[in-house]
Amino acid sequence: MKFIVEREHLLKPLQQVSSPLGGRPTLPILGNLLLQVTEGSLLLTGTDLEMEMVARVALSQPHEPGATTVPARKFFDI
């Protein structure tokens, strides 16, 4: 998976999907965000098992499709 996105386009959606991830999760994976690259967009998903937030960010550069999870706090700090 490979994609390029400007930080300014990513910041607001990242804040939205990170909101249900506050505090220390009971399961470590719940502190991560799911990143999915498909058809010209990046999908960001965050959940605490009770609430799920999904945001879409348009990608203007060519990309390679794929999916992975990343620690939400570290990704947001970058």
From Swiss-Prot:
Report whether Chloroplast shows up as a keyword of the record. Answer: no
Q: Where in the cell is it found?
A: Cytoplasm
Provide the protein name: Beta sliding clamp
Q: Which SUPFAM superfamilies would you find in this protein's record?
A: DNA clamp (SSF55979)
Entries under Gene3D superfamilies matching the protein: DNA Polymerase III, subunit A, domain 2 (3.10.150.10)
Its organism's taxonomic lineage begins at: Bacteria, Pseudomonadati, Pseudomonadota, Gammaproteobacteria, Enterobacterales
List the InterPro entries hit by this protein, alphabetically.
Answer: DNA_clamp_sf, DNA_polIII_beta, DNA_polIII_beta_N
Q: What does the function comment of this entry state?
A: Confers DNA tethering and processivity to DNA polymerases and other proteins. Acts as a clamp, forming a ring around DNA (a reaction catalyzed by the clamp-loading complex) which diffuses in an ATP-independent manner freely and bidirectionally along dsDNA. Initially characterized for its ability to contact the catalytic subunit of DNA polymerase III (Pol III), a complex, multichain enzyme responsible for most of the replicative synthesis in bacteria; Pol III exhibits 3'-5' exonuclease proofreading activity.
The main location class comes to: cytoplasm
The gene designation is: dnaN
Sorted keywords for this record are: Cytoplasm, DNA replication, DNA-binding, DNA-directed DNA polymerase, Nucleotidyltransferase, Transferase
CDD domains linked to this entry: beta_clamp
Is the keyword Transmembrane helix assigned to this protein?
no
Species source reads: Serratia marcescens
Q: Name one GO biological process term.
A: DNA strand elongation involved in DNA replication
